[in-house]
């Protein structure tokens, strides 16, 4: 093992949005920065998020925006105070990338792609002097407190004045966020919360072979889902071989996960006709059926067919279909029970990680002076819709600013 010939003032570990933003914040202030990432290139999960349309942030009013972080709103809000969704859009425009607001309020780059944005950003970082080292996996610290890095040539040691860890959560490990950092921080006495899947699909006890064969992958829309005691949310979701996934499910994933942890399962109320009230639907289904099949009657008078009709038959008792009043009620409120989340590796994001209480206002670990954390490795979560990326960018900026204050005060790593 040997020391790198030029030890950086600041080492940033992790090349996702949080790490890159921390590096930019530091470099813009004139601080030499080296960024290390285990993968052959940086921003891999960011690029994956751009498949099908790069939803970068949301145009929602700021107080409502912040409420999306639920019980972590008070912890995330200070990051957003200095870099909110409006600031993020302005920053993107400075990179030469235009944005637009979709009908749902989601904000996208004009070309809907992540790659041009990442290329422009990396060009700026290199112009600012940020040195990016790929295929460089962080292995923790040695006995003298130096950073250990596995690189293609062997192992190298670093002793920067400050370190920013932006290593991601535990979802999509093949793209770099494998959660291996948990053991390294735990070994240094940092208390962590277990990583859990967030924005994830959920499994049912078992679909019928018919439903799996015919309708796995089929969208269920329009639809509304509600947990007990909560108002319904409208949107769409997808049937899978094992259960359900999709934007409507992701929006409820934190509450569903909590219910499963408490009760061993979560029973949602599914509304397959959210745009019609029960009385009107009951009158429509009560019309004489004549010689037409029940399937055609349901399609013509309730607008339910295909995958939605198959799901209704899967979930409702057989006798429901003998009484049009009961059928109308089932269309509006049929129980859908899920029993477990899909594996963390499949989730869009993760909950758990470094508790915000373990960090000071500059996102420095109280247990490890000079070591800062940012991004999804922190214990917060948010629904899809641009909220995840916004907080990753904002936390990276907050960590970078925290390092600047630390250095200005004469701090250095032990």
Give names to the regions the model predicted.
Residues 76-84, 103-123, 172-177, 203-205, ...:
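Short beta-strand to alpha-helix junction loop
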Residues 171-184, 188, 379-411:
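A conserved FAD-binding loop/helix module that cradles the flavin
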Residues 28-29, 41, 62-64, 81, ...:
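Residue-level recognition of phosphate/Mg2+-coordinating polar/acidic sites
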Residues 134-146:
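A conserved short coil-to-beta-strand element within the FAD-binding core of flavoproteins
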Residues 8-35, 403-404:
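N-terminal Rossmann-like FAD-binding beta1-loop-alpha1 element of flavoenzymes
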Residues 27-51:
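Glycine-rich FAD pyrophosphate-binding loop
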Residues 11-13, 36, 138, 157-173, ...:
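Short hydrophobic core segments
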Residues 162-208:
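Glycine-rich loop(s) and the adjacent beta-strand/alpha-helix scaffold that form part
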């Amino acid at each position: 093992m040997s020391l790198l010939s030029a030890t950086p003032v600041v080492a940033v570990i992790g090349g996702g949005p949080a790490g890159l933003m921390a590096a930019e914040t530091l470099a813009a202030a004139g601080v030499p920065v080296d960024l290390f990432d285990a993968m052959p290139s940086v921003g891999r999960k960011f690029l994956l998020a751009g498949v099908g349309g790069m939803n970068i942030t949301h145009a929602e009013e700021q107080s409502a925006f912040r409420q999306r972080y639920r019980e972590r709103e008070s912890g995330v809000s200070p990051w957003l105070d200095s870099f909110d969704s409006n600031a993020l859009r302005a920053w993107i425009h400075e990179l030469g990338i235009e944005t637009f607001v979709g009908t749902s309020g989601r904000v996208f780059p004009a070309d809907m792609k992540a790659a041009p944005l990442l290329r422009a950003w990396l060009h700026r970082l290199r112009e600012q002097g940020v040195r990016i080292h790929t295929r460089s996996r962080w292995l923790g610290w040695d006995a003298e407190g130096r950073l250990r890095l596995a690189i293609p040539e062997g192992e190298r040691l670093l002793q920067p004045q400050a370190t920013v860890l932006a290593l991601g959560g535990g979802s999509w490990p093949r793209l770099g966020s494998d959660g291996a950092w948990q053991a390294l921080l735990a070994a240094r006495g940092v208390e962590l919360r277990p990583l859990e899947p967030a924005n994830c699909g959920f499994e049912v006890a078992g679909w019928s072979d018919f439903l799996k064969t015919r309708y796995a992958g089929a969208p269920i829309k329009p639809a509304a889902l509600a947990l007990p005691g909560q108002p319904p949310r409208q949107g769409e979701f997808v049937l899978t071989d094992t259960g359900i996934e999709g934007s409507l499910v992701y929006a409820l994933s934190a509450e569903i996960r909590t219910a499963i942890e408490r009760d061993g399962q979560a029973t949602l109320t599914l509304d397959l006709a959210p745009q019609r009230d029960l009385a009107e639907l009951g009158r429509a289904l009560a019309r004489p059926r004549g010689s037409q099949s029940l399937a055609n009657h349901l399609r013509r008078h309730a607008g339910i067919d295909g995958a939605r009709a198959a799901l209704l038959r899967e979930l409702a008792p057989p006798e429901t279909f003998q009484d049009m009043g009961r059928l109308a009620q089932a269309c509006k409120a049929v129980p859908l029970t899920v029993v477990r989340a899909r594996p963390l590796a499949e989730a869009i994001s993760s909950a758990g990680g470094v508790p915000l209480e373990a960090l000071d206002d500059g996102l420095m670990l109280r247990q490890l002076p000079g070591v800062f954390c940012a991004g999804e490795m922190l214990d917060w979560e948010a629904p899809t819709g641009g909220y995840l990326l916004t907080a990753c960018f904002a936390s990276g900026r907050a960590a970078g600013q925290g390092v600047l204050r630390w250095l200005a005060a004469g701090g250095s790593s032990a």
